[in-house]
Amino acid sequence: MWRKRTEETNRKDERLQRKLFALTIVCLALILNSCTAILSTSNSVGSSISALMSSPKKIDNKITNPIRNDVRLAVLWVRHATLLIQIDDKFILTDPVFTETTAFISKRLIEPGIEVKNLPNINVALISHLHADHLSIGSLDMIEPKVKELLVPQEGLVYIPNFSFNSSEIKLWQTWEKDGLKITSVPVLHNGMRYGIDSDWLDKSFTGYIIQYNGITVYFGGDTGYETGTTLFKETGRKFPDIDLAFLPIAPIHPREYSKGRHTGPVDAIKIMQELNAKKMMPMHFDTFAESYDTLGEAESTMRAEMIKENLSDDEIIILNIGEQKVVIPR
C-alpha cells in the first residue's frame, strides 16, 4: 500500500540520510554524467541563452478567484503539465511548476497562468515523475501552505523534503482515497530518473493518474510516449471505461526519433485518447520552457491539423490558452 510520511521526531536521522543521499547523487551526476547531460540538453541550453537574458512573458488579466460554484468539472491551465482541476468541491493540482527555470537549464518563456497566492486550498497535488519540469522542489515550497496531500510515484519519496503537508508514495494500480476522492496510479511509457545516473534504480518512478470523484473520471498522463503495439492505454481504458477528460502531452515533437518512446506528439496523443476511449482530451506540455527543437506554436498548429484529419471538434479536443479556465461539465 501507499506509504505516508509522518513528522515524528525520531525520524530526524532518516531525513538527514535522505538529504545526504540526494546531495551525493547530484554531485555524482555532475562528475560522471556531464557528457551525457551536455549531449541530451545541448539544445535546451542553446535555446535558453536568449530566454535567460529576459523575463518570462507577462500574462494579463489572470484569474484571481478560480473557485467555481457552477461546475461539476473545470480546468485551469497553469502551463506545461501544471493543471488546476476542480471536481465539485475538490481541487487537484498536477505537476506543480511555478519557478522561472527547471534544473537551471530550461527557462520559462511565459508566466504561470495563475499566481500562487490565488490558488485555492489543494486537496491533493500529484507528481507524475521525477524530472525537473514535473517535480519542482522550489514550487512545492511556494505552494506548501495551500496543499493538504502530495502523491508521488513509487521510489519518489526520497527526493521530497519535509513539508507540512502529508507526502505519500503510490505504486502502480494502487488507489489512494480520502473523503470520496480516489486517485489511482496507471502505467505510462516514460522513464523515472532525476539526475541521469539514478536511472538504473529508479525504474518504477513514473506514472499516470486516474482521478475519480462523485461519478466524474479524469485521466492525467504526465509525460508519456507511445509505441505501436503497446496495450497499456487500452488496459487503462478497460479498467476505467468512462473517462470524461484526458490530459495528454503533445510536445516535444522534435527530434521524433528521440522523443517517440518518451513524449507523444499530437498524432500519438490522439491515438492514446482513442485507446483510452476518453470522451474529451485536453493537450498540455507545450510552449512553456525553452527545451526542445519545436518552434513556438508548432505543437498547437500540428494538433489542429490532426483534428481536421480525424474529424475531431473543438469540444472533443479542448485547447486552452494559458491561464484560461474551461468549464467541461457544468452543474
Residue ranges and their predicted role:
Residues 51-70, 152-216, 302-324, 328-331:
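Metallo-beta-lactamase
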Residues 74-77, 91-95, 182-188, 217-223:
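Active-site-proximal beta-strand elements of phosphoester/diester hydrolases
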Residues 72-74, 145-149:
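Short active-site oxyanion
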Residues 55-68, 78, 84-130, 137-142, ...:
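Pre-active-site segment of Zn-dependent metallo-hydrolases
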Residues 96-99, 130, 188-189, 222-224, ...:
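Active-site metal-binding loops of divalent metal-dependent hydrolases
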Residues 85, 95, 129, 136, ...:
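Divalent metal-coordination and catalytic microenvironments
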Residues 2-13, 17-20, 32-93, 100:
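Zn-dependent metallo-beta-lactamase
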Residues 37-39, 124, 149-151, 155-158, ...:
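Cap/insert and terminal regions of metallo-dependent hydrolase folds
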